[in-house]
Amino acid sequence: MPTTFADSPTRFVSAANGIDYAYRETGEGARPLVLLQHFRGNLDNRDPALIDVLAATRRVITFDNAGVGATTGTTPNTVAAMARDAVDFLDAMEIDQADVLGFSIGSFIAQEIALSRPAAVRRLVLASSAPQGAEGMHGWAPDVIEAVGSRVPGPEGVLKVFYAPSPASQQAGQQSLGRIYARTDGRDKATTWETRLAQYDAVCAWGIPNHPLLQRVSAIKVPVFVANGDSDPMILPHYSYLLAGLIPQAQVKIYLDSAHGFLFQHHTEFAADVEAFLND
């Protein structure tokens, strides 16, 4: 098994739902850590530095959900349907139980998996997340949409949303982008505009204020680590505290001078925190 993300080839697995899922595996271990990706992200939009630190002690699996990147099928426009597609991937991989790390929209999907298939999740990490039905989550601010929602988002938009405006955070963002773009062979297919539209519809529906749905997340009984950057403009940090307060076995950490991409900027610290949490 490859020990670095840069050396991990893209493989495919066929699921019972008729979808061929693109995925990569890095590291070794009995129980996998499955990663669920952010808005518009494919296999290549993860910082290899984070994957490599996580994979030093465990088997890490990254994959494109239905309709994303090289995976076949169509991206649905609800989080619940995305979670069903993710569970179909786990079944195709013959993974009965995993630790799950969801980032951004991937954290919404991770919550839904923990609620709909609780036996499949041992421990849950929710990065840049919010509970369904939270007030103020129905859509993003115009400057955020302009930065990451355009037809061809560039590095300037990523730096604006994923990193704090400080020189240190912006420099860390440039370094992370350099690592992400370093892979030249076997790169994933770009995420389509149709997937972008479907994912944003799902995010907006997740954020419709609804108090009964807000309470749903309290049914998650596994240990949960909630994390975010202190300057995230996409999913504001106070939602991390709300989420952790609703989940019985949750802990929360906010990383300083960072934003939506805090886990890339602080990859060493975050990976160490995840390692300690998963081994607790």
Task: Go through each PLM region and give its residues.
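Gly/Ala-rich beta-loop-alpha elbow adjacent to hydrolase catalytic centers
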Residues: 102, 106, 110
